[in-house]
Amino acid sequence: MKKLFTLAMLLVVAIAANAQTKKVSILGDSYSTFKGYIPENYAPFYPDGNNDVKEVEQMWWSLYIQAKGYQLEKNDSWGGTTICGTGYMGMDSSRSSFIARVDSLGSPDIIFVFGGTNDAWAQSPIGEYQYADWTKEDCKSYRPALACLLDTLQKRYPKAELYAILNSELREEINESTREVCKHYNVQLIELHDIEKQNGHPSISGMKSISDQ
């Protein structure tokens, strides 16, 4: 009888522990890609010959998940993508933009949005602050696109904790715009600093810094 009781208690504990395991999804760009862990048609950066990150366990999100005891739900990260619908050389990137991928995150408890880097590097239009009634044309600029993205994520995943991550060494126009839009939607913004990079992307040391920050 005691053995049965003990087994039952262990089962209850195991079920409770499993129920408490949070699921994490990432909506990102090349900084969060790793071959085999993103959709097959997406362009990965990692692993790369010019960067010392070679194993998925060295990625910032993997380090975070391991440290917290969480599990990966979805990693919808695509190298070279912008939050807005204007990519490099002014090309229309609406189909690969962060906004176009909001429905691909599964059923997460936590969502990390790690973008804006390519918007900065591609010199995408900054636009005006706009918090409703977005058109496709509006979302070709950074400020309205980020607002549309956060608004859509909050409505699509109302129970999820939403965090935005802002890369270091971006132009101040992007930084300030991101702060303002995140403040409007009460989204916690993680502003990175002192991130070691190789070939423009976080190294092993940089990945650890991202995870820790």
Where are these regions (language model features)?
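Short hydrophobic segments within beta-strands
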Residues: L27-G28, I165
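Short active-site segment of divalent metal-dependent hydrolases/proteases
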Residues: Y31-S32, G206
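Active-site environment of divalent metal-dependent phosphoester hydrolases
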Residues: T33-F34, R171
